[in-house]
């Protein structure tokens, strides 16, 4: 879970990119798995979420945010939890 000291301050400009995301207004269940979801159902949901991310104008900002604060759940910037974890283990904090 992100620690408060890792999160950006209350400056609205820092979060402005979220207003331009294609996911804005989309049900969060597309990006965050329900309890017990596995296998094919999870793979299909993640694939749909990543398809939206690929054409999103703020994918780089979203991905950078998720890596910088260690978002533990969901699809962020076209990356799943396990993909982000792998990048972080390799020492990559930001990737566009």
From Swiss-Prot:
Domain 4Fe-4S Wbl-type: 22-86
Function: A redox-sensitive transcriptional regulator. Maintains intracellular redox homeostasis by regulating catabolic metabolism and polyketide biosynthesis. Regulates expression of the redox buffer ergothioneine (ERG). In concert with myothiol (MSH), another redox buffer, responds to low pH leading to acid resistance. The apo- but not holo-form probably binds DNA.
Keyword DNA-binding among UniProt keywords: yes
Cofactor: how bound: Binds 1 [4Fe-4S] cluster per subunit. Following nitrosylation of the [4Fe-4S] cluster binds 1 [4Fe-8(NO)] cluster per subunit.
GO biological process terms on file: cell redox homeostasis; negative regulation of DNA-templated transcription
PTM entry text: The Fe-S cluster can be nitrosylated by nitric oxide (NO).
Lineage top rank: taxon: Bacteria
Species annotation: Mycolicibacterium smegmatis (strain ATCC 700084 / mc(2)155)
Cofactors: [4Fe-4S] cluster
Sequence positions that bind [4Fe-4S] cluster: 23, 53, 56, 62
Name of the protein this chain belongs to: Redox-responsive transcriptional regulator WhiB3
GO CC annotations on file: cytoplasm
Disruption phenotype: Not essential.
Pfam families: Whib (PF02467)
GO molecular function: 4 iron, 4 sulfur cluster binding; dinitrosyl-iron complex binding; DNA binding; metal ion binding; protein-disulfide reductase [NAD(P)H] activity
InterPro entries linked: 4FE4S_WBL, Whib
